[in-house]
C-alpha cells in the first residue's frame, strides 16, 4: 500500500511535521498542490484535504528533513515560471541521489525535477485547483495544501528524502511567486480556513535519514497587497484534467425576476393599498345574502350586498367583485320600498283594544253585526271580539302556515316601477337587521336629499306651470293624511300630495295601492301631470275618507305608529271608503257607464271598490269593449291611466278585434297612444 504525506502551510506560521502521524488514502495517486486563496471566494474545501491535521506517513526507514531558508543549498535556489499554465513535475531518478533542476527561460516552461540517468518522464500529475485571488487587501486569509503520494516502490528508494525536501520547499516558494506577480494560476483551488498552529519539518544532517529534534519554521509569506496596492488582478485560467472532477458552477444570469426585484415587491403592497376603495361610498351594512333570479327557474344565488349612506343598495356576484368594483347592480332606495312576506311592518303591529266612541283618535269603526259587537280592524283582535269573527280552521291552514315558515327569512324590495328584488338571509335576526337598516336608509335618504332639478331647469315654462297648478289645487297645500304644510311628494294612482314621512309609509303599502313620486326629483310626463291636476287631495279624501265620521286624523304631534295605523286602515283595509251609489247595475257595468260619461269621481270610487274581474267587464257580447276601449275612444288619458293602474287588460280586444290602441289612434290622442305603448299594448300598425 502507498503512503501519503500531507502538508498545510499558512504564511504566518512555521512549518513542522510531527513524527509518524498520518492517515492512509490509497485512492489518491497524484500530487496536489494548493496555492493561497482569499476567503471571499467561498469555495468549499476538498474532502481529501483536512487542514486541521498535518500528517506524514512513510515507510519504516523513511525520514523527513527540513532545511531552513538560510541553509538552503545553492543548487535548490530556483525561480518559478511566470506562465499561469506552468506545472511542477516530479520524477524519480533510480540512478543518482542528486536532485537537479533545469528551469527554462521560456515563460511556457515548467519547473522540472528529473533524475540524472533517466530522461523519460514516468508519470505526470498535475494539480487541478482554482486560484482565487481576493480583490481586497491580503491579511493572512489564505493557506496552501500539498499531498504527496508515496507508493511502496518509491518509499524504498534512498533518494526519496531529497524529493520530499524539494517539494516541501517548493510550497512556500510557489505562494510567494504567485502573490508577487499574479501570474501563477492554480485552477480549482478549494479554499478553507486554516486551523493548524504550527507544522515542523525536521531534517537530519547526516543523511542517514534519522529524525532529530532540530527544527525551525519556514518564514512567513509577505502580504503582497501591502507592498503593491495598485496592481490589477487578471482573470485566472483553468487547467483541464481528466483525473479530478470539477465542481458545478451555477450562473447568476437566470435569476428569477422575483428575487431580482425585492424593492419592487416591497413597494407593491404599499402602492396597492393606496388605491383600494378609492372613490366609493363606505357601506353602513354589508354581507352575503341569497337573491332569487328573475328568470323562470327562480334559483337562489349568493350575492354580496352593500347598503351605503347615499341611499343605494348594491349587490355583487361575489366578494371579489366588490373588491374590484365590477359586475354590480344598484337599487335606488329613494324610489323603492321594502316588504316582508307574511309579516306586517314592525311599526304597525301594536295591539288594538276595542275603541269606544269617546276615543278621540281611534281607528276602529263600530259596525252592526247583529250581535252588538264592535270589530277592531287592527292586525290584532281583542279578546272581547264576537265569536262570529273567529271562523273555523281551514283545511289548508297548516299548508299556508308551512309556506310562511319557508319564507321567514325573506324580504323583498319593490321599486316605483313595479320591479321586485327578492333576498333571503340565513336567520330571521339577520333579516330583521337588514329590513331595519334599509327602512332607516330610505327615510334618511328622502329627508336629506335636495332637489336636483329646480324650476328653472324644466324643459319648458308649461311644465313649471303644470307642477305649480298641481300644488295650487284644493287641499294640496297640506298633506293628504294629516296637516303637514307644503307637501313635496305625490301618489300617482291616488292623485294626492303628501309629506315625506307619509311617503315612506305609502311606499310600504306597495305600488298596487300607492305609487310614490317626488315633485322635485322625478320627471313628470304629460299624462302624469294631467292625472295629478284632475284629482287632488280634496277629491281623493271625499272618496277614501267618505265614511270616517267620528274618527280623528293624526296630527303633527302624532307618533309614526299612529300615522301608519291610520294610513293602512284608510287605503289597505278601506275602512273609511265612501259607499257605492245605489244602482241596479253591477259595479263593472256602472264603471263602463261612468267611463263613457267621463265621470271621474264616480270612476275613482268604483275602481277603489272593484276587483280586477269587475274592472275588465265588457259592455256585452255584441260589443266586447272594456272601459279602456271607451276611455281611449274619448281620448281621456286620465281615465285610461287609472284603469291601467287598477288592472285593466291592455291586450284585450273587442268583438271586432280592435285593441284600445286602435281607438286611441281614431281619437288622435297621442297621450293615450304613449300610455298604451308604454304598458305593452300591441301596435298593429308596425
Curated annotation (Swiss-Prot):
<feature type="compositionally biased region" description="Low complexity">
    <location>
        <begin position="211"/>
        <end position="225"/>
    </location>
</feature>
<dbReference type="InterPro" id="IPR036770">
    <property type="entry name" value="Ankyrin_rpt-contain_sf"/>
</dbReference>
<comment type="similarity">
    <text>Belongs to the centaurin gamma-like family.</text>
</comment>
<feature type="region of interest" description="Disordered">
    <location>
        <begin position="382"/>
        <end position="404"/>
    </location>
</feature>
<feature type="region of interest" description="Disordered">
    <location>
        <begin position="256"/>
        <end position="278"/>
    </location>
</feature>
<feature type="compositionally biased region" description="Polar residues">
    <location>
        <begin position="226"/>
        <end position="241"/>
    </location>
</feature>
<feature type="domain" description="PH">
    <location>
        <begin position="282"/>
        <end position="443"/>
    </location>
</feature>
<keyword id="KW-0343">GTPase activation</keyword>
<keyword id="KW-0863">Zinc-finger</keyword>
<dbReference type="GO" id="GO:0005096">
    <property type="term" value="F:GTPase activator activity"/>
</dbReference>
<dbReference type="InterPro" id="IPR001849">
    <property type="entry name" value="PH_domain"/>
</dbReference>
<feature type="repeat" description="ANK 2">
    <location>
        <begin position="656"/>
        <end position="685"/>
    </location>
</feature>
<dbReference type="Pfam" id="PF12796">
    <property type="entry name" value="Ank_2"/>
</dbReference>
<feature type="compositionally biased region" description="Basic and acidic residues">
    <location>
        <begin position="258"/>
        <end position="273"/>
    </location>
</feature>
<dbReference type="GO" id="GO:0008270">
    <property type="term" value="F:zinc ion binding"/>
</dbReference>
<comment type="function">
    <text>Putative GTPase-activating protein.</text>
</comment>
<dbReference type="GO" id="GO:0003924">
    <property type="term" value="F:GTPase activity"/>
</dbReference>
<dbReference type="InterPro" id="IPR037278">
    <property type="entry name" value="ARFGAP/RecO"/>
</dbReference>
<dbReference type="InterPro" id="IPR038508">
    <property type="entry name" value="ArfGAP_dom_sf"/>
</dbReference>
<keyword id="KW-0040">ANK repeat</keyword>
<feature type="repeat" description="ANK 1">
    <location>
        <begin position="623"/>
        <end position="652"/>
    </location>
</feature>
<keyword id="KW-0479">Metal-binding</keyword>
<keyword id="KW-0862">Zinc</keyword>
<feature type="region of interest" description="Disordered">
    <location>
        <begin position="205"/>
        <end position="242"/>
    </location>
</feature>
<feature type="domain" description="Arf-GAP">
    <location>
        <begin position="464"/>
        <end position="584"/>
    </location>
</feature>
<keyword id="KW-0677">Repeat</keyword>
<dbReference type="InterPro" id="IPR002110">
    <property type="entry name" value="Ankyrin_rpt"/>
</dbReference>
<dbReference type="Pfam" id="PF01412">
    <property type="entry name" value="ArfGap"/>
</dbReference>
<dbReference type="InterPro" id="IPR011993">
    <property type="entry name" value="PH-like_dom_sf"/>
</dbReference>
<protein>
    <recommendedName>
        <fullName>Arf-GAP with GTPase, ANK repeat and PH domain-containing protein 5</fullName>
    </recommendedName>
</protein>
<dbReference type="InterPro" id="IPR001164">
    <property type="entry name" value="ArfGAP_dom"/>
</dbReference>
<dbReference type="InterPro" id="IPR051282">
    <property type="entry name" value="Arf-GAP_GTPase_ANK_PH"/>
</dbReference>
<feature type="zinc finger region" description="C4-type; degenerate">
    <location>
        <begin position="479"/>
        <end position="502"/>
    </location>
</feature>
